[in-house]
Design a protein with these regions (language model features):
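C-terminal structural segments of small proteins and small subunits
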Residues: 46-76
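Amphipathic, hydrophobic secondary-structure cores in small proteins
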Residues: 18-54
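Short glycine/serine/threonine-rich phosphate/pyrophosphate-binding segments
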Residues: 15
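A generic structural signal for beta-strand entry/edge sites
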Residues: 2, 31, 63-67
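Short amphipathic
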Residues: 1-8, 33-35
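Short cysteine clusters
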Residues: 12
Length: 76
């Protein structure tokens, strides 16, 4: 199932914190699409995923919006 998180207009570290909070509510294998506007999230969210056992399965940049798609792993 695809879940979404709107982290637009949030600055570091809020996109990562909101992503972490949302992932805690999901099960392994579920997909989360995080939409944000902070360019730092392109580095911060994938780094957080690597550390916590999740997988970035896609990134998309559209004007000012960035969408990072994550597959939730076992390591919530």
């Amino acid at each position: 199932m695809m879940h979404t998180l709107d982290a637009k207009r949030m600055l570091c570290p809020m996109p990562v914190i909101r992503t972490q909070d949302k992932v805690k509510t999901l099960s392994a294998g579920e997909i989360l699409a995080v939409t944000c506007t902070d360019p730092g999230a392109l580095n911060d969210i994938p780094a957080w995923c690597r550390i916590n056992g999740h997988k970035v399965i896609g990134t998309q940049r559209d004007d000012d919006e960035i969408i990072i798609t994550i597959e939730v792993g076992d390591g919530k």
